[in-house]
Amino acid sequence: MTNKDESVEKNTESTVEVTNVKQNIDDSVEQTEESKGHLQDEAIEETSDENVIEEIDPKDQKINELQQLADENEEKYLRLYAEFENYKRRIQKENEINKTYQAQRVLTDILPAIDNIERALQIEGDDETFKSLQKGVQMVHESLINALKDNGLEVIKTEGEAFDPNIHQAVVQDDNPDFESGEITQELQKGYKLKDRVLRPSMVKVNQ
């Protein structure tokens, strides 16, 4: 093969290589354009989806706002209802306490009169007039005590009971073999309670 032929062959190969390179470049450009087209399509689809979401959101947002408002109103109602119930219970309790205190003051003022009536009933006499008068006083005493008991007054138990400093007041110590140590042997003055409140402790003699 001559030098001329070799030169022609080399030129032909170079031309083929250039053609191949150009083809590769064209293919790459085409692929790039296709990829770009796909990306644009996806972007358009996403934009469309966003537009749909934006179109739906206002309605859903309004529903959510109304639901939130309803929940808040329900919570406020329940809180106010609970506060009102607590207020009613507190007022009722205060009224009961006030009634108890009012009755306590009245009954405390009456106790000395009851003591005097009971002392009068302990007086002995043979005169018929005296006995008749004493019987009338006794009836008044019983009626008064029953009325006070109906309103919560209670006589504190004493003789034979164990001494309780919450309701008893020890005035004298006793040494009586018929009673246990700490037992009350004698009541010196009656004590009274109004329900769970001590109006006046009983004055007692306690066995040592």
From Swiss-Prot:
Stretches with biased composition (Basic and acidic residues): 1-12
CDD domains, alphabetized: GrpE (cd00446)
Disulfide pairings: none
One of the GO BP terms on file: protein folding
Compartmental location: Cytoplasm
Gene Ontology molecular function: adenyl-nucleotide exchange factor activity; protein homodimerization activity; protein-folding chaperone binding; unfolded protein binding
Region (Disordered): 1-49
Matches recorded under InterPro entries: GrpE (IPR000740), GrpE_coiled_coil (IPR013805), GrpE_head (IPR009012)
Record-linked Gene3D superfamilies: 3.90.20.20, Head domain of nucleotide exchange factor GrpE
SUPFAM superfamilies assigned: Coiled-coil domain of nucleotide exchange factor GrpE, Head domain of nucleotide exchange factor GrpE
Record key words, sorted: Chaperone, Cytoplasm, Stress response
Compositional bias ranges of the Polar residues kind: 13-23
Highest taxon listed in the record's lineage: Bacteria
Cellular component terms per the entry's GO annotation: cytoplasm
Keyword flag Nucleotide-binding: no
Purpose of the protein: Participates actively in the response to hyperosmotic and heat shock by preventing the aggregation of stress-denatured proteins, in association with DnaK and GrpE. It is the nucleotide exchange factor for DnaK and may function as a thermosensor. Unfolded proteins bind initially to DnaJ; upon interaction with the DnaJ-bound protein, DnaK hydrolyzes its bound ATP, resulting in the formation of a stable complex. GrpE releases ADP from DnaK; ATP binding to DnaK triggers the release of the substrate protein, thus completing the reaction cycle.
Annotated HAMAP family: GrpE
Subunit structure: Homodimer.
Family: Belongs to the GrpE family.
Protein name: Protein GrpE
